[in-house]
């Protein structure tokens, strides 16, 4: 089985290395880098969040389980909705999953993100993705992993996603 790893908003693909090193060799492991993020060269056709999402989804070309953290979970949901024949499972770690987080009174990550990642495009933090109405159509096995001390994606978000 192919395992595809999607990083959070930093785009740091090395985030996954400690986990990947522990996995058996019979899994194919693919880490998708985000063009223009964390030292990955920019792509001339990526000018919006939708462009980046479409780029990520286009990288998935064989049956796979997606393992995604934070912002990567939004790309994983997009891929699952668009490539139902190829996505065989989801592991979502502390992600919004594309729902509106206002009801959860979460800490806004955008200001701190802008200060830390000055090179990131403005559209990355201003875009609001809403997949909530489509989440109930996802029928594949999904594992939700949350920490109970996360101010950006608190455990209540994971509990809510589990109910959908």
Give a label for each model feature.
Residues 68-76:
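Gly/Ala-rich beta-loop-alpha elbow adjacent to hydrolase catalytic centers
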Residues 4-8, 69, 146:
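The conserved beta1-alpha1 loop
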